[in-house]
From Swiss-Prot:
SUPFAM superfamilies: Carbamate kinase-like, PUA domain-like. GO terms for biological process: L-proline biosynthetic process. It catalyses: L-glutamate + ATP = L-glutamyl 5-phosphate + ADP. InterPro entries: AceGlu_kinase-like_sf, Asp/Glu/Uridylate_kinase, G5K_ProB, Glu/AcGlu_kinase, Glu_5kinase, Glu_5kinase/COase_Synthase, Glutamate_5-kinase_CS, PUA. Pathway: Amino-acid biosynthesis; L-proline biosynthesis; L-glutamate 5-semialdehyde from L-glutamate: step 1/2. This is Glutamate 5-kinase. One of its GO terms (molecular function) is ATP binding.
């Protein structure tokens, strides 16, 4: 047993989500690297043996489908990707099933779309299912349901999906294993002076600019999506590590007290369950632009958002839908559940709360978003 294995074994039992990207599972080739996959399964099995709960978020369905069909020439269209995903998902899960069986472990497949997370009841059902699997000693293997997901209902990438899965199962740690050692000060593939960032306490615009937007050609996630996932997870109280996913003992190395990667510390005050859903579940239906005074009240004082502070309403949304709250420059300030529709909010924007009933003929309270229904993003 390595030193890192011993340190993980000595730690308190934790729930750990391990996200494995396409580049990790293929090694940059066009086929699944089953020799490396068995090494990853071995480490997950060892974690489970040590008393930890493990959830795997696995990419690779499209790569597996392309391999199984003999690398056909297909048009670059959504239907082609869904075809490959439909064929490849069964191949991928069979591979994981056979590899985990070597260690006496059963797995359970969960295929999710954003629609499963946007509705609060379906969100809770997904949470109950994943927890039931874990409680019964079964390792959930989760992927986005690419065979049926359209752009409207896709989470978009397995980095963000893994953060949502972490919230579903109440994870302590999220490992984002990739083809890079972590987050660098610049792209290490282009800049030889790029330095690895060991620890992150706050995710700001500087970090987002560093992360950029591009990734590998085989997958859909680059470093930018990993940063988004880390931001979601850490706000839910989950520690996140971005680390290299190739080589021996990569999972134990990432979980060690001094991980070989970039560690994102969780926020000191983790969000309550309802606010975790607001942050992670629904896609925002519209934007509410607020003035600087309202920004200060929401961010620094934790106040509800009042109509007086609203300057502009963008998009269409109904009462009860999740919206984005931004400042005049377009920076995201918060996400929350709107107490009024976009039409009503446009009418009362900039008005005093006491005037709402005279303007609309009714009111749903003095707040356009109550603080209990709002997650502040700006730090």
């Amino acid at each position: 047993m390595t030193t890192n294995q011993q340190s993980v074994a000595a730690s308190q039992p934790k729930t750990i989500v391990v996200k494995l990207g396409t580049s990790v599972l293929t090694g940059g080739t066009l086929a699944l690297d089953r020799a490396h996959m068995v090494e990853l399964a071995r480490q997950c099995a060892e974690l489970k043996k040590q008393g930890h709960s493990v959830v795997v978020v696995s990419s690779g369905a499209i790569a597996a489908g392309r391999e199984h069909l003999g690398y056909p020439a297909l048009p670059n269209a959504m239907a082609s990707k869904q075809l490959l995903a439909a064929v490849g998902q069964s191949q991928l899960i069979q591979t994981w099933e056979s590899l985990f069986a070597l260690y006496g472990i059963k797995i359970g497949q969960m295929l999710l779309t954003r629609a499963d997370l946007e509705d609060r009841e379906r969100f809770l059902n997904a949470r109950d299912t994943i927890n039931a699997l874990v409680d019964n000693g079964i390792i959930p293997v989760v992927n986005e349901n690419d065979a049926v997901a359209t752009s409207e209902i896709k989470v978009g990438d397995n980095d963000n999906l893994s953060a949502l899965v972490g919230i579903l199962c109440g994870a302590d740690k999220l490992l984002l294993l990739t083809d890079q050692k972590g987050l660098y000060t610049a792209d290490p593939r282009k800049d030889p002076n790029a330095e690895l960032i060991k620890e992150v306490k706050v995710i700001d615009d500087t970090l987002r600019k560093i992360a950029g937007g591009s990734g590998t050609t085989l997958g859909t996630g680059g470093m930018a999506t990993k940063l988004q996932a880390a931001d979601i997870a850490r706000r839910a109280g989950i520690e996140v590590i971005i680390a290299a996913g190739r080589g021996q003992n990569v999972i134990f190395d990432a979980l060690s007290p001094a991980p070989q990667g970039t560690r994102f510390l969780p926020c000191e005050e983790a969000l309550e369950n309802r606010k975790r859903w607001i942050l992670a579940g629904p896609a925002a239906s519209g934007d509410i632009v607020i003035d600087q005074g309202a920004v200060k009240a929401v961010v620094e004082k934790g106040s509800s958002l009042l109509a007086k502070g609203v300057t502009k309403v963008l998009g269409e949304f109904s009462r009860g839908e999740v919206v984005r709250v931004t400042d005049a420059q377009g920076h995201l300030v918060a996400r929350g559940i709107a107490s009024y529709s976009n039409q009503d909010m446009a009418k009362i924007a900039g008005k005093h709360s006491k005037d709402i009933i005279s303007i609309l003929g009714y009111d749903y309270g003095s707040e356009v978003i109550h603080r209990d229904d709002m997650v502040v993003i700006q730090e």
